C-alpha cells in the first residue's frame, strides 16, 4: 500500500550491517548493482542511491520497484515511501493526508523513529503529534481509536538527517548477503524437493 505521493523505495538490509566498514561498502555497492539489474530486467525505471543502512530507489513506479528490490539477496525488507523535508509540519501534513486516503476505520498507531538529534522532536513526541494529526483528519468520518500493540492501521515515519520517510507496509526479502559477495558453494541435490530448499535456506 502506497502513501499518497510515494516517490521512493526504502531498502533495508541486516547481515551486512555486522561487517567492517570496508567490507560493508563493497557489499553495499554490489547490492545496488543487483537491485539495478532487477529493475532493468523487469523494465522498471528507477535510480538507486547508495546510502548507509538504507539504500533508496527513486522511481515513478514505487510498488513495482519495491517488489523487485525485495527479491535481491541481502535485502531484509522494502517499503514504498513518501519523502519530505525533516520538518514537523510537512511530516504531520503527510500523516494526515495518508490517513485520509487509506484509513477505513478501526484502531491505528504511529511508529516514529529518528536518527540523530537535529530533528526538533524526539520519537515519542513525533508519534504523539502524528497521532493527533491522524485523529483530526479522520474523526468526522470514523470513530478512531489508538492501539499501540495490535493496530489495524499503522503509519511509519523515519527521520534521517535532512529527510523524512513515511511508509505503511513492508515487503519481506530473502535476507542474507548480496549475490556475488561470497565464494561459490556446492549443494548436493537428490531427487526430492527438500535438498534445494535446504540449500536455499
Predicted regions and their residues:
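RNA-binding accessory domains that recognize and position tRNA/RNA substrates
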Residues: 1-186, 200-201
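Short glycine/serine/threonine-rich phosphate/pyrophosphate-binding segments
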Residues: 194-199
